[in-house]
């Protein structure tokens, strides 16, 4: 059982080591711990015996072990930390006109990677939970057409396709009406189920020639199952991990699945210190944080970095960026859902943000 003083010593060593990356000796702790150097050394030895500290080869000081970082994150790290010095910089970074959702999420990933020096990942709302709210087909020529699918009344997905050679002149209109009548208002998960169960029978009923019709359904709607994901700072991973991690980051859909499955529905923030079941992430820290995309649902923000990262700094940056990001997304969707609405981050708003009044 770790004592209160030992906990304070471990916290200080973690903070000092992540800031300087130098082993910490007992004398360096005396100003903050109300005990003699000998007592501190004795507690450091006990922490080492418990596996929370380890000796450095070139110094008499100690540094946190993997277990030490895990204990610190689980027992001492405040997940609500915000450094007000970062707020203004983050707000200014989001002061641009966005033409689509992807512009905002991409900017957030770039900013998070830049400010943390780690790998940043932003994931849109989980595909299966999104709802199909619009479907149109635009015929481009005699041989090809464009399917326009709208998710959650705001996110368009376009799929260009070749019209099957066996399609009759009326088949495209039948296809359009079937989708509008059977799929509109359903979640992507429900649509996936219907494609596998009732759609084959419906195709047999409404199409004289059924060849390629099911394939066309599958082709168009397969685009809804892909994660919208933004990954920045991949090269940075080479500084804190091996080539396996870098190669893992090169497969966005695999990354999306691994990171999404690592945080449960009832968790808002989760930090895994070398605890991932994904082999490429087993020797790194992954911080995952949920944020709201207005009118649509919950999205995810992740930081992937070294085990010895500055955790308090990382938590603060994630909190600040996610909260300002939500403000930006709120303005964006408010604009889309109004007849005429202009959005500017005024100086008064910036002052309120800096005081923390708009970040709750």
UniProtKB/Swiss-Prot annotation:
Family: Belongs to the HrcA family.
Function recorded in the entry: Negative regulator of class I heat shock genes (grpE-dnaK-dnaJ and groELS operons). Prevents heat-shock induction of these operons.
Organism: Streptococcus thermophilus (strain ATCC BAA-250 / LMG 18311)
Record has Cell membrane as a keyword: no
Residue stretches in coiled coil: none
Keywords: Repressor, Stress response, Transcription, Transcription regulation
Cited PANTHER family: HEAT-INDUCIBLE TRANSCRIPTION REPRESSOR HRCA
One GO molecular-function entry: DNA binding
HAMAP family with a match to the protein in the record: HrcA (MF_00081)
UniProt-listed InterPro entries: GAF-like_dom_sf (IPR029016), HrcA (IPR002571), HrcA_C (IPR021153), WH-like_DNA-bd_sf (IPR036388), WH_DNA-bd_sf (IPR036390), WHTH_HrcA_DNA-bd (IPR005104), WHTH_transcript_rep_HrcA_IDD (IPR023120)
Name this polypeptide is given: Heat-inducible transcription repressor HrcA
GO biological processes: negative regulation of DNA-templated transcription
